Amino acid sequence: MLTRPELKNQSLAMLRGKWTQPVVAALIVTLVSAFTQGGSQTQSATFITLGFLVMLLVAMNLQYGFSVGMLRFHRGRENTVNEMFSAAFKEDYGRVLGLMLLGALFIFLWCLLLIIPGIIKAYAYSMAPYIAEDNPELDPIECLRRSEVLMYGHKMDLFILHLSYIGWILVGILTLGIGLLWVKPWMEMAQVKFYEELKAEAGNNPIQA
């Protein structure tokens, strides 16, 4: 397993000179996610609720698409925006939506106990989009299950990797959020590398247990 500095430095090196596509993809995801938190006060509650639900579903699929798009970038397919939309909406929309909805539902149910179990479960499921990409024959439940197995003993490692970006996140916030458009692809690429390392340790077969 690569060290945290190695994961971050290698991810940054892969993105150097190729930021445009990942940054535009991050902007699209951010704008759609932000839209789900808004809503005009002049519109009816029903219209706002329906619009929110539609945009929430779109945002969930886009987040999946972004994760898979960065995985494909790592493997040489660098048209991230096109790959994001293709993975999110064109290739297997129902399966993707099922994966994201079930993951969100399970995390929510764990959060009903306490916030910490919900966070732990979120990290347990964090590899599910990559597993779904690499194993198109698997259903959403199996992707989530295999992610749990793959992340067993590694959830804290990924949490600390994410935590190591806190300084860059604060800098991004100070730039009115603009800098976060570069931090998001960098973090995602580091997570992709983390996944590839875990998969290699598991013998490129995540995971049959």
PLM regions: where:
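Hydrophobic alpha-helical membrane segments
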Residues: 1-209
